């Protein structure tokens, strides 16, 4: 790394395939380990004696609230990180550091606002998200503690993106690994040894996130980081922040609309099939998040290379990086699809010993995940638009699958009378929306990608 210019020669000169996997593998590991935060909680909660199934469903109802917290971290960092990479490619490290400082202040401000909202309005929010009388107490126990750690979640997720943007993929992976490993240890200790149950799971999670947060801040303030977090840059600069928010709006909307999808599933299934179906969709969305995190790990490996070389005017390396990303994402989504189609009962059994809930989830999984094999195509194309700074197109594609297609299908299909089983109709909305979204996204991407990379070379 050239400290004066902020350029990393490897991003512009190293063999793309080797560089991609060097960045992607730690990012994938970090993303998959990050899933453990939620998966471990849900597995332990589902195995609580007597009330485990109800508690699992209750904690599932809190997931939209947790998604909102993560979405705001993405709004700031997923837009800020590509801009930092582009500025590194242009040799402007001072501007890149000012972006990091501005984004840090913004993350802290958002965290305080979200904490107040969650603490003051938890009950109506959880009711809106699909909590029933039976599941509300467990949902309230979890979110009332979890929301107190919002600032740790925001900073650990948000600032870690700036570590990845500099090419420090191993350090980025350790951020998540440290917290997840601690969570795995603390969960059974607080839940079963100390007898805290659901509250113990929430406390273990926020303490683990606090440790991850401390690790991230320490690294960015140290001399090991090429771009450093400096006190003088913490005052927000709106001229720098607004372009970051514009670019981060696409991943933000992806997560917010994922939240709307979760609420739509919860409310519709509660009406047509009851708490068992809501518990099943908790397991299904967790499984889908496993697929999503795998794919996002791949895109995080590609993004610094694509953004850097797009900023440097090297269209050939951008195209080569996308080719590797596309093949990798499609392969990854197909592997997850095969696992869910072949072993749905085993996947469901990981989360709960309850025979009724496990059997219902296995049945629903083959419907819900039917088109997940091709989902990698949409992620590769959509996130490449983000890496190339194409905010408007990326925002449209983020809205397409969930707001334009999936949510209306969830609400309409069980009411049209086409299917005898209303619950089947709700779950079937997912593969229909996935298929339509993949076709549209691929068509838009491949008609624009060549012009974008050619334009970079001529800039």
What are the functions of these language-model segments?
Residues 1-26, 84-151, 193-249, 306-371, ...:
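Short alpha-helical transmembrane segments in multi-pass integral membrane proteins
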Residues 22-41, 145, 179, 208-212, ...:
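Transmembrane helical elements of multi-pass membrane transporters/channels
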Residues 53-64, 139-143, 202, 273-290, ...:
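Small-residue hotspots at the loop-to-helix junctions and early N-terminal turns
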Residues 77, 146-164, 172-180, 201-214, ...:
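Short runs within selected transmembrane alpha-helices of multi-pass transporters and secretion channels
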Residues 56-116, 153-172, 280-338, 342-344, ...:
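Small-residue-rich hydrophobic transmembrane alpha-helices
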Residues 34, 38-45, 70-77, 81, ...:
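Alpha-helical transmembrane segments and their lipid-water interface positions
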Residues 11-51, 64-79, 83, 108-115, ...:
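N-terminal transmembrane alpha-helices
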């Amino acid at each position: 790394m050239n400290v004066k210019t902020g350029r990393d020669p490897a991003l512009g000169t190293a063999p793309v395939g080797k560089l991609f996997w060097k960045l992607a593998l730690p990012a994938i590991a970090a993303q998959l380990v990050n899933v453990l935060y939620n998966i471990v909680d849900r597995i332990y909660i589902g195995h609580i004696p007597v009330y485990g199934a109800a508690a699992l469903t209750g904690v599932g109802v809190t997931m939209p609230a947790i998604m909102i917290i993560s979405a705001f971290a993405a709004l700031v960092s997923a837009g800020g990180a590509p801009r930092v990479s582009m500025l590194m490619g242009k040799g402007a490290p001072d501007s890149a550091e000012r972006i990091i400082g501005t984004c840090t202040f913004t993350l802290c401000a958002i965290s305080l606002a979200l904490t107040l909202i969650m603490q003051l309005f938890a009950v109506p929010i959880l009711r809106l998200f699909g909590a029933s009388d039976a599941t509300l107490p467990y949902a309230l126990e979890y979110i009332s503690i979890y929301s107190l750690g919002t600032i740790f979640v925001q900073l650990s997720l948000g600032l870690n993106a700036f570590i990845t943007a500099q090419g420090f993929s191993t350090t980025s992976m350790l951020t998540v690994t440290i917290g997840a490993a601690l969570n795995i240890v603390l969960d059974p200790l607080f839940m079963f040894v100390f007898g805290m149950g659901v509250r113990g799971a929430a406390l273990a999670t926020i303490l683990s996130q606090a440790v991850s947060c401390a690790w991230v801040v320490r690294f960015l303030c140290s001399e090991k980081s090429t771009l450093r977090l400096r006190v003088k840059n913490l005052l927000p600069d709106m001229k720098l922040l607004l372009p970051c928010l514009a670019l981060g709006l696409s991943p933000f909307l992806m997560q917010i609309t994922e939240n709307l999808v979760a609420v739509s599933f919860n409310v519709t299934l509660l009406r047509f099939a009851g708490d068992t179906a809501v518990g099943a969709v908790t397991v299904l969305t967790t499984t889908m998040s496993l697929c999503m995190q795998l794919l996002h790990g791949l895109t995080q490996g590609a993004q610094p290379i694509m953004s850097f070389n797009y900023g440097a005017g090297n269209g050939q390396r951008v195209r080569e990086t996308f080719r590797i990303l596309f093949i990798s994402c499609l392969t990854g989504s197909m592997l997850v699809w095969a696992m869910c189609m072949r072993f749905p009962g085993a996947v469901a059994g990981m989360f709960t010993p309850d025979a009724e809930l496990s059997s219902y989830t296995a049945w629903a999984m083959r419907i819900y995940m039917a088109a997940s094999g091709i989902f990698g195509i949409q992620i590769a194309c959509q996130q490449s638009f983000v890496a190339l700074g194409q905010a408007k197109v990326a925002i449209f594609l983020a809205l397409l699958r969930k707001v334009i297609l999936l949510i209306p299908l969830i609400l309409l299909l069980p009411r049209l009378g086409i299917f005898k089983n209303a619950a089947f109709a709700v779950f079937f909305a997912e593969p229909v929306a996935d298929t339509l979204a993949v076709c549209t996204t691929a068509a838009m991407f491949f008609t624009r990608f060549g012009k974008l990379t050619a334009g970079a070379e001529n800039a």
